[in-house]
């Protein structure tokens, strides 16, 4: 069975929020190879300062950010009426955090480092 094709006529925009610059660069590279457009933010606060979340097909949020957590970011966006699907990712996993992420509302929860195909599949499900 072949791999799914993710390319669309107009690139799907994925917003990525992570405070690790190297990780952001890797994710942008992966997604661009598969036809996605990306917008990146190094903090939840930076994303909240604008209206970028309104233009995205999905949000890829790190849970453990320097200020507002990815989970709190999702809650704030949902509270302001955003219905943009969320994929949470974290390098520090525990059962409480996983449950909190699920309760906040997400289409996927990925443990870093994750297989690139898992991310692509999660985005296909979300977008």
Residues of each region from the PLM?
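Two-component/phosphorelay signaling modules centered on CheY-like receiver
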Residues: 21-39
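C-terminal output helix
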Residues: 96, 114-124
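Acidic catalytic/metal-coordinating carboxylates
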Residues: 42-43, 69-72
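The feature encodes the CheY-like receiver
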Residues: 66, 94
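Acidic, metal-coordinating helix/loop segments flanking the phosphotransfer/catalytic sites
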Residues: 40-58
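Short amphipathic alpha-helix used as the core "switch/output" element in two-component signaling
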Residues: 71-82
């Amino acid at each position: 069975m072949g791999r799914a094709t993710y390319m669309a006529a107009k690139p799907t925009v994925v917003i990525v929020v992570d405070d690790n610059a190297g990780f952001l660069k890797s994710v942008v590279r992966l997604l661009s190879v598969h036809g996605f457009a990306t917008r990146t933010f190094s903090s939840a606060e930076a994303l909240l300062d604008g209206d970028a979340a309104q233009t995205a097909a999905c949000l890829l949020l790190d849970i453990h950010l320097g200020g507002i957590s990815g989970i709190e970011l999702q809650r704030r966006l949902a509270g302001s009426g955003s219905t943009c699907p969320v994929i949470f990712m974290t390098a520090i996993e525990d059962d409480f955090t996983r449950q909190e992420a699920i309760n906040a509302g997400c289409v996927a929860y990925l443990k870093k480092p994750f297989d690139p195909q898992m991310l692509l599949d999660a985005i296909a499900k979300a977008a």
